[in-house]
Amino acid sequence: MRYGMSVPCFGEDPRMFGRLAREIEAAGWDGFFVWDHIRWRTHWPGGVLDPWILLSVAATTTSRIKLGTLVTPPARRRVAKLAKETVTLDRLSDGRLVLGVGLGWPPDVDFGWLGDEADNRVRAAIFEETMEALVGLWSAEPFSYHGDHIRIEEVQLRPGPLQQPRPPVWVGAKWPNRRPFVRAAQWDGIVPVMDTTKHDRALSPDDVRDLLELIGEQRGSLDGYEVVLGGRSEVGTEGAGRIAAFAEAGVTWWVEAIQPEGDWFAEAATRAGAGPSR
């Protein structure tokens, strides 16, 4: 089991995120992840910062921990720009990038109101094409792509990422919807959450076993596949016991998920300093 922390990309001072990442690394965590939003809620009063710049700041203050987004919605990103951002961060961090991707939420506030596609089915189709094209552009070889939403004609983007053949990709998906998990099976990891429109509860270890059975059917093997679960854990043995139950079910990463409530940044710093609940 490896341990990370995820925080909202909210605030006004990007340097705070670099300091937090340094504290996370010093306390023995394995990863630092940030949300990817342009807006969040209709009446959200605070600032929202760019995740790639925040992660670049974090890359300069750390040397060991994994860095990434949880999650980026490729459907609203120009694929060439996303390729450049991810390659640059992977090189800046000496090969520590993890790209977390998903459809994104909320579809109105964070997409439709900004002129981006709000329909989930259309965004899913754009997601598929963007990810296929992204892998091609990461190759640093001449690449063409002809899809319904994305067209690329003999483009070669250099340099490629430091990690070869590409950085790992984790896919966010809501359980128990099958299709997103089938989509995620072709990549390197899953970031599952419960679809609260269907079940008013968090994921359980049994849910993890069920979703891994589905992914295993698609992949044939779960060797090397990451299962990344976000939640909150108590410091010490009580938290470690709860996490152990998920580890037995197949979870490989526990991510302490900080929510933007109250003085959440101070809470994140305190929890980071306490270290993971091993």
Enumerate the predicted regions with their spans:
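Active-site-adjacent structural elements that line small-molecule/cofactor binding pockets in enzymes
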Residues: M1-R278
